[in-house]
């Protein structure tokens, strides 16, 4: 038997530069595909070719050549004597490829991703099968069991649909090939004939003929194996006819099966003892060795000895027959009865019915077949005429479209999962939309989406779970964003805008509620009552959404009606030098917060008395409010050399330090928020959030009647007295000499002191000032506090408490209002004004407010001018900001579970310096 080399990869065969000597021989192409058993070294498709060619072509433990770009691989072998070209397809159904795929999928891949990857590989395997069905005359399906795998029915229907879709693109590629017109029109030499080879795997015992008791039963005409073959043929034919894979006209079918020839063959292994098999092989080897010169051996000696040793049923079957029983044919005889029809150019006449149509058939030469096979390989397998993929590692567009055809046939799991998930989507949508307001926020959307996903996960199953979970997410977001999205802006009192998603009107633009999206101002529908800068007039106010409307615009409107004619001390603001000034970027160093907290701890450790100087805080603010290139001192040392002035009448002066406003302010960039101790140097806001107004002279305040302002709770509108000691020199101290006699009508000081107690000591004058911390709630209720969390209750002639305690402690910025509402939510009042009556006396009262509206690292806010000397003989009122905000955002009022002491006005807000 003349053979051609060993197995070759099909792509190498088609692209070979040298032409073989048999290029003009007419060849029959036989394709083999199918599944193999999982056991290593078990029955394999390669062993069939070894048996058919009677030659050891493929090794026992054959491994296909590894090509990273190809999971499925074609291998070929040409038997020149019989003029048969075998094309073997190895894919994921083989043990080696399956093991490698499982190793790749075990590297942390999710179930859905693994399923998708596996189905993509199955579709690519179908493309290789389509190629095999397009270039072969005969196809052999190999299966490791004796039961027909029903999944092949879906596979063949998918291949048929895929072939019909790709046929228009295959025809043009063959127009230049030297083959017949029918081949060019149908893109195949003939409708291939499909044969089936099964393995028993112990399902049917094949007893040796010498064994078994002798019986008088009449032997059956067919052996059990042949009867099983006939049963499988009937079953396969019925299945394919019912599913219309096979029809009357073979020219329209993907493949054909013969009507009057066997197309199923069963390979049966004898049940052998391994020890007996080895002993029998040894005997045969010895016998062959003794008679080596007498018996001619064709082919490799080793393979011939293996064949004689094992006597596999698909190699050489015993031709002896029982009486009356037909002899089973060998595997080669089974296959070559169909090959002979090809080589003799008779073709396959497998059409049935009343009017059968003849099918085309062509037997090409080896060279013509290679030219056609190369063209089809480039189109079907390599996709050379396709566009590049949309992304690296993806599939080309045409290949994706072809693979889409296969989804409905092959991916039953995904189809079931998609149907199941699609049924779960309406239930999830209902769960999302249940109990929803017309407009709602992101938080409500996320909560409802989580509830919808819980309902969805109870009903959805399979690999499409994540896909439709994303669809549910998109549907819910689309429902929310199409007219149900509430404006996400929160007011400075931490309340959401009630409008649906809208745009803010630009400068000079009108409000358009009917526009989509509408153009509206923010509105939370919350209203409160506030007082003007001086506190005399009250008016309702809208819930503010920005600092300017909260701390400036509202008071400017009331300023025109009430406080406009009063004296003011204005705070410095940003003065632009360009038409389009820009807000300054946040350049505050994170370390500034640490320095601020450390400085506050230093302040708390040092006891402060009445009127103690706040120069230490000022020094800290100067040292810590630096730009991004600045450095921070290790400790607060700026106030060490400063001589503090006592509130009891010391003559010492306070050394002035330059404040932020004394430096050159920027005229290009403005501060977007409010001034605090960590603000960059030289930056000022465009407006001031503070106000300092003079209500009148000091005598305009009546200690017995208090303030005559609206909204005060009875008995709480009084200011606390603050006695300031002014130290003076004794009378005639310069003229008095203790060593001389006293002047006429004068007594000796020492004796006078000993005689009249207190009449000869230094005379101390006391100036009386008045201080009041006013709190105001959202309903306009106002009251004074005489200390932390202590509401003033004055009866009769005014309060008896002194202001010294309140000035030397941190006053709360928020406290519970004495008039609580009916709800369970606590109602807070906020420190809004500081009233100071400055007497007409030789004393200076310096105002230095510092407010920390939250726990650290909340900044400490100060006015644009940190220290203000209040002129004498006046009733002054400092209006605090309604809301506080830095360049990082607003500082909201405390919640129910937050500690109120963290929101405070620092002690040392007032101090005195005698003149």
From Swiss-Prot:
It comes from the Eukaryota. Keywords: Nonsense-mediated mRNA decay. Residues 593-607, 649-660 have a biased composition (Basic and acidic residues). Disulfide bonds: none annotated. Residues 608-629 have a biased composition (Polar residues). GO terms for biological process: nuclear-transcribed mRNA catabolic process, nonsense-mediated decay; regulation of protein kinase activity. Pfam families: Smg8_Smg9. The keyword Cytoplasm does not apply. Residues 219-228 have a biased composition (Basic residues). Involved in nonsense-mediated decay (NMD) of mRNAs containing premature stop codons. Is recruited by release factors to stalled ribosomes together with smg1 and smg9 (forming the SMG1C protein kinase complex) and, in the SMG1C complex, is required to mediate the recruitment of smg1 to the ribosome:SURF complex and to suppress smg1 kinase activity until the ribosome:SURF complex locates the exon junction complex (EJC). Acts as a regulator of kinase activity. Belongs to the SMG8 family. Component of the SMG1C complex composed of smg1, smg8 and smg9. This is Nonsense-mediated mRNA decay factor SMG8. It comes from Xenopus tropicalis (Western clawed frog).
């Amino acid at each position: 038997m003349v053979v051609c080399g060993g197995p070759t990869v099909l792509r190498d065969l088609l692209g070979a530069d040298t032409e073989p000597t048999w290029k003009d021989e007419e060849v029959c192409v036989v394709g083999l595909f199918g599944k193999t058993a999982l056991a290593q070294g078990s029955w394999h498709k390669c062993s069939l070719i070894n048996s058919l060619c009677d030659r050891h072509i493929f090794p026992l433990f054959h491994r296909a050549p590894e090509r990273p770009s190809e999971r499925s691989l074609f291998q070929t072998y040409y038997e020149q004597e019989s003029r048969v070209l075998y094309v073997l397809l190895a894919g994921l159904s083989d043990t080696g490829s399956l093991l490698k795929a499982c190793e790749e999928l075990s590297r942390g891949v999710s179930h859905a991703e693994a399923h998708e990857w596996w189905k993509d590989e199955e579709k690519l395997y179908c493309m290789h099968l389509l190629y095999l069905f397009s270039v072969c005359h005969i196809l052999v399906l190999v299966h490791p069991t004796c039961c027909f795998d029903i999944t092949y029915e879906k596979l063949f229907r998918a291949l048929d649909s895929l072939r019909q879709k790709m046929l228009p693109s295959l025809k043009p590629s063959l127009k230049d090939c030297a083959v017949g017109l029918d081949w060019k029109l149908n893109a195949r030499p003939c409708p291939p004939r499909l044969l089936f080879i099964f393995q028993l795997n112990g399902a049917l015992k094949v007893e040796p003929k010498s064994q078994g008791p002798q019986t008088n039963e009449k032997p059956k005409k067919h052996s059990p194996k042949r009867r099983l073959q006939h049963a499988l043929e009937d079953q396969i034919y019925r299945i394919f006819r019912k599913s219309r894979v096979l029809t009357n006209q073979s020219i329209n079918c993907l493949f054909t099966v013969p009507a009057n020839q066997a197309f199923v063959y069963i390979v049966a292994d004898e049940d052998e003892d391994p020890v007996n098999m080895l002993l029998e092989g040894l005997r045969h080897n010895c016998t062959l060795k003794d008679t080596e010169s007498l018996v001619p051996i064709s082919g490799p000696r080793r393979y011939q000895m293996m064949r004689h040793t094992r006597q596999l049923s698909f190699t050489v079957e015993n031709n002896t027959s029982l009486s009356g029983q037909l002899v089973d044919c060998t595997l080669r005889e089974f296959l070559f009865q169909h090959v002979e029809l090809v080589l003799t150019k008779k073709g396959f006449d497998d059409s049935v019915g009343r009017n059968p149509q003849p099918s085309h058939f062509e037997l090409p030469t080896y060279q013509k077949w290679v030219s056609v096979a190369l063209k089809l390989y480039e189109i079907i397998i390599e996709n050379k005429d396709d566009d590049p993929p949309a992304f690296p590692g993806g599939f080309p567009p045409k290949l994706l479209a072809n693979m889409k055809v296969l989804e409905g046939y092959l991916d039953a799991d995904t189809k079931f999962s998609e149907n199941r998930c699609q049924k779960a989507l309406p239930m999830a949508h209902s769960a999302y939309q249940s109990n929803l307001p017309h407009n709602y926020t992101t938080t409500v959307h996320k909560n409802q989406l989580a509830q919808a996903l819980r309902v969805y996960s109870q009903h959805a199953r399979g690999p499409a779970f994540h896909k439709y979970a994303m669809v549910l997410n998109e549907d819910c977001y689309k429902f929310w964003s199409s007219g149900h999205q509430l404006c996400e802006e929160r007011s400075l009192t931490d309340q959401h805008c009630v409008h649906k998603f809208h745009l803010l009107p630009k400068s000079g633009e009108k409000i358009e509620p009917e526009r989509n999206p509408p153009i509206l101002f923010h509105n939370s529908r919350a209203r409160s009552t506030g007082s003007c800068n001086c506190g005399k007039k009250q008016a309702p106010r809208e819930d503010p959404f920005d600092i300017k409307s909260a701390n400036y615009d509202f008071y400017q409107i009331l300023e025109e009606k009430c406080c406009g004619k009063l004296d003011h001390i204005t705070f410095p603001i940003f003065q632009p030098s360009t038409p389009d000034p820009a807000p300054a970027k946040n350049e505050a160093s994170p370390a500034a917060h640490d320095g601020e907290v450390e400085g506050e701890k230093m302040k708390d450790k040092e006891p402060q008395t009445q009127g103690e100087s706040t120069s230490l805080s000022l020094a800290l603010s100067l040292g810590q409010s630096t730009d991004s290139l600045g450095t921070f001192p290790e400790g607060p040392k700026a106030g060490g050399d400063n001589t503090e002035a006592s509130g009891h009448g010391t003559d010492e002066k306070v050394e002035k330090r330059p404040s932020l406003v004394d430096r050159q302010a920027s005229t290009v960039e403005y501060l977007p928020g409010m001034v605090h101790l960590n603000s960059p140097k030289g930056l000022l806001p465009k407006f001031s959030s503070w106000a300092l107004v003079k209500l009148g002279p000091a005598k305009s305040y009546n200690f017995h009647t208090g303030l005559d302002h609206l909204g005060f709770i009875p008995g709480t509108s009084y200011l606390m007295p603050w006695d300031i000691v002014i130290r003076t020199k004794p009378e005639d101290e310069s003229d008095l000499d203790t060593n001389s006699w006293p002047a006429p009508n004068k007594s000796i000081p020492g004796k006078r002191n000993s005689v009249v107690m207190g009449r000869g000591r230094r005379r101390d004058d006391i100036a009386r000032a008045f201080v009041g911390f006013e709190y105001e709630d959202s309903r306009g209720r106002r009251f004074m506090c005489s200390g932390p969390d202590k509401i003033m209750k004055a009866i009769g002639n005014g309060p008896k408490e002194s202001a010294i305690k309140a000035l030397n402690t941190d006053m709360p910025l928020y406290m519970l209002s004495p008039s609580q509402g009916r709800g369970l939510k606590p109602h807070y009042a906020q420190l809004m004004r500081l009233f100071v009556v400055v007497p007409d006396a030789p004393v200076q009262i310096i105002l230095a407010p510092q407010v920390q509206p939250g726990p650290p690292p909340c900044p400490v806010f100060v006015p644009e001018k940190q220290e203000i000397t209040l002129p004498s003989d006046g009733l002054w009122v400092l209006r605090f900001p309604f809301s506080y905000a830095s360049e990082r955002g607003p500082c909201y009022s405390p919640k129910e579970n937050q500690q109120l002491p963290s929101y405070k006005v620092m002690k040392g807000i007032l101090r005195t310096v005698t003149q």
